[in-house]
């Protein structure tokens, strides 16, 4: 039996500069939906890509001394690398410079021209190059007047200066579809989400009257040329929007994917381009006599405390920085938990670090670590299949687990990601409280309570399994690691439909002997400072007055052996304000290292960190403690910061 299909798209991004956290927000949200729908059993197709034509790209390439494609290939490589880091599960990546797209754009344009929806005329209007958008005088922000006449102004979308442009252009007669579009809105009240966006489209754009749309340009030549009039380049409204069907093979020799997946179930985008997707795109599809997408969802902006992100303000957040230092799960979790989907949200370094420490490290990570440690301590790591008595709290706990699943599913269907995650964390917090209420350490002292102790452990493991499955659309590394450490290897027990009833984990399990923290705690002050520093624009390089150290030969450097290791224990050295005694794990070996970082880190804050260790130093004694290596750190103005490595690097890996 064929699966139901689900087709989801992000906007295609304009690669005129490096992507920021806002672009990652849209794409992670799409990925969360795609993963969730796959868990529900849908045949999902998830599309993202890049909008690569236009005047701004041409100017950027010329400034860089490259051809347009040379410039674009470099930019797209960075974008694809970012999506790979975030483990975005897209099924296709469309580039508007691809031949498969170009051919569809040409056919669509000529069809609309032939049937009279497009006509040739002359356009004069206010144009913003960065936005690739024309505006009427009434739409301009901060208009500039001379002798009572508008002579300039700014884009209402981005605030960039506009210029008066006059050129021959093809126009798309969208006004004739106004009544049909409004009728579609009435028949499909959930088409535009959130509802406030629908009111904005009707009141601000449709009711004042839709003006015919300029859909070609002659002032630049980087784009798809109109086949019947090659001096014209097809403008963004048709070129970019058509990607949603060109990627499926519409009007190609093979329309299998188009027939299977169209119409789209949801188009995701930021709110500044909802007008194009909720007015122009539906009208274009009507003109082509194609079904319309089922939903257009416009999420809000990620703002900073001082407004929108801007390089000049030094408040642009590079998602690569967050992923490289804190991991993809912490980054994905923050975006989906802290920012209510559909509304604007504010990014702060403080909130990012707090979410990572309190939600991920303390609540989730500590629950997993405590549970595995207790199973090792009380059952030698082997928890038998439970068949004993229940604790008086268990019925409420089991009922809450099932209610959490229902609430989670309801919120996921309405794209309330933050609320869905909140319900999971209430369940995680309640499970942590369950440990305190059942007091396994007391039960373990009474041999007559052995079966009850096994029951408590079984409920903890089952609760963790429930939470882990629900987190799979959001987190990618942590669920795999949790199932690995719990040794729950049956793939059926990783599935969403296994949560229809409580207690599916009926088999005995053998947990890992040495649980590794899933999310190491962060040093709050140090990491907030690090994120803030990373947001600043690059400083001009000045020559240092301090002489560098004597140069060494590569053979000298080659003598130093540096390996990746995980800190598994740490404590203060008695009678020392500077030293910490640290135990690290290197592949199959553990070592003790004494490090002078006590003034900058508390012992509990560094457990679980992946660090770089010099492993071939001669052993030394510091304050009576043996030290078998050196943990590398960076020093600036007397402040030491541990050099953290990505968690994906295995212990013992040689750093070169």
UniProtKB/Swiss-Prot annotation:
Alphabetical keyword list: Aminoacyl-tRNA synthetase, ATP-binding, Cytoplasm, Ligase, Nucleotide-binding, Protein biosynthesis, RNA-binding, tRNA-binding
Instruction: Say yes or no: keyword Protein biosynthesis present.
Output: yes
Write down the chemical reaction(s) this protein catalyses: tRNA(Met) + L-methionine + ATP = L-methionyl-tRNA(Met) + AMP + diphosphate
What biological-process GO terms show up in the record?
Answer: methionyl-tRNA aminoacylation
Q: Spell out the GO cellular component terms annotated for this protein, sorted alphabetically and separated by semicolons.
A: cytoplasm
Q: Which GO terms describe its molecular function?
A: ATP binding; methionine-tRNA ligase activity; tRNA binding
Q: Write down the superkingdom of origin.
A: Bacteria
The record places the motif ('HIGH' region) at: 13-23
Residues in tRNA-binding domain copies: 556-656
* SUPFAM superfamilies recorded: Anticodon-binding domain of a subclass of class I aminoacyl-tRNA synthetases, Nucleic acid-binding proteins, Nucleotidylyl transferase
Where in this protein would one find the motif 'KMSKS' region, according to its record? 308-312
Could you tell me where this protein is found in the cell? Cytoplasm
Give the EC number.
6.1.1.10
One Pfam family of this chain: tRNA_bind
Binding-site positions, ATP: 311
Q: Does the keyword Lipoprotein apply?
A: no
InterPro entries, from UniProt? Answer: aa-tRNA-synth_I_CS, Anticodon_Met, M/V/L/I-tRNA-synth_anticd-bd, Met-tRNA-synth_bsu_C, Met-tRNA_synth, Met-tRNA_synth_2, Methionyl/Leucyl_tRNA_Synth, MetRS_core
Q: Which family does it belong to?
A: Belongs to the class-I aminoacyl-tRNA synthetase family. MetG type 2B subfamily.
Question: What's the subunit arrangement here?
Answer: Homodimer.
This molecule's function is given as: Is required not only for elongation of protein synthesis but also for the initiation of all mRNA translation through initiator tRNA(fMet) aminoacylation.
Query: What name does this protein carry?
Result: Methionine--tRNA ligase
Which gene is the coding source of this polypeptide chain? metG
């Amino acid at each position: 039996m064929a699966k139901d299909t689900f087709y989801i798209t992000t906007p295609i991004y304009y690669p005129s500069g490096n992507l920021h956290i806002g672009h990652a927000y849209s794409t992670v949200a799409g990925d969360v939906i795609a993963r969730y729908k796959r868990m529900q059993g849908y045949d999902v197709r998830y599309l993202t890509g890049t909008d690569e034509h236009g005047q701004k790209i041409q100017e950027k390439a010329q400034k860089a001394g490259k051809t347009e494609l040379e410039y674009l290939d470099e930019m797209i490589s960075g974008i694809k690398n970012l999506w790979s880091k975030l483990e975005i599960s897209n099924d296709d990546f469309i580039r508007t410079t691809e031949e498969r797209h170009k051919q569809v754009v040409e056919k669509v344009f000529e069809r609309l021209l032939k049937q009279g929806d497009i006509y040739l005329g002359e356009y004069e209007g206010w144009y913003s190059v960065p936005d690739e958008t024309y505006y009427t005088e009434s739409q301009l922000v901060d208009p500039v007047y001379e002798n009572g006449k508008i002579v300039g102004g700014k884009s209402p979308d981005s605030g960039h200066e506009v210029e008066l442009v006059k050129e021959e252009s093809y126009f798309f007669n969208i006004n004739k579809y106004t009544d049909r579009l409004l009728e579609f809105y009435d028949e499909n009240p959930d088409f535009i989400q959130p509802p406030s966006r629908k009111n904005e489209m009707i009141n601000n754009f449709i009711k004042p009257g839709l003006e015919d749309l300029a859909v070609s340009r002659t002032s630049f030549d980087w784009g798809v040329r109109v086949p019947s009039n090659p001096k014209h380049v097809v403008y963004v409204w048709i070129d970019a929007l058509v990607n949603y069907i060109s990627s499926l093979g519409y009007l190609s020799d093979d329309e299998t994917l188009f027939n299977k997946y169209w119409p789209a179930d949801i188009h995701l985008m930021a709110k500044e381009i909802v007008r194009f997707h909720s007015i122009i795109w539906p009208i274009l599809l009507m003109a082509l006599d194609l079904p319309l997408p089922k939903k257009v969802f416009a999420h809000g902006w990620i703002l900073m405390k001082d407004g929108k992100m801007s390089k000049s303000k030094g408040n642009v957040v590079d998602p690569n920085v967050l992923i490289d230092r804190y991991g993809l799960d912490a980054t994905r979790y923050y975006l989906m938990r802290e920012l209510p989907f559909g509304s604007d949200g504010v990014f702060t370094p403080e909130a990012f670090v707090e979410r990572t420490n309190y939600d991920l490290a303390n609540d989730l990570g500590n629950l997993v670590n405590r549970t595995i440690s207790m199973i090792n301590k009380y059952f030698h790591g082997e928890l038998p299949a439970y068949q004993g008595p229940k604790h008086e709290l268990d019925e409420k706990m089991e009922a809450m687990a099932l209610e959490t699943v229902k609430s989670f599913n309801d919120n996921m269907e309405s794209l309330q990601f933050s609320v869905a995650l909140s319900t999971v964390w209430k369940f995680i917090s309640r499970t942590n409280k369950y440990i305190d209420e059942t007091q396994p350490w007391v039960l373990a002292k009474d041999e007559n309570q052995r079966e009850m102790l096994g029951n408590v452990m079984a409920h903890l493991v089952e609760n963790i399994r429930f939470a882990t499955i629900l987190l799979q659309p959001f987190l990618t590394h942590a669920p795999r690691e949790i199932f690995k450490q719990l040794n729950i290897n049956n793939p059926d027990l990783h599935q969403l439909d296994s949560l229809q009833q409580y207690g599916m984990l009926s088999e005995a399990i053998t947990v890992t002997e040495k649980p590794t923290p899933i999310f190491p705690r962060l040093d709050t002050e140090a990491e907030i400072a690090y994120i803030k520093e990373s947001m600043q624009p690059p400083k001009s390089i000045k020559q240092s007055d301090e002489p560098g150290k004597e140069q060494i030969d590569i053979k000298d450097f080659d003598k130093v052996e540096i390996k990746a290791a995980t800190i598994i224990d740490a404590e203060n050295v008695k009678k020392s304000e500077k030293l910490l005694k640290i135990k690290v794990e290197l592949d199959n070996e553990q070592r003790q290292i004494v490090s002078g970082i006590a003034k900058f880190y508390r012992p509990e804050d560094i457990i679980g960190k992946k660090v770089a260790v010099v492993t071939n130093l001669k052993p030394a004694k510091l304050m009576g403690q043996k030290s078998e290596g050196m943990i590398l750190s960076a020093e600036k103005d007397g402040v030491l910061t541990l050099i953290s490595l990505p968690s994906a690097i295995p212990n013992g890996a040689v750093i070169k």
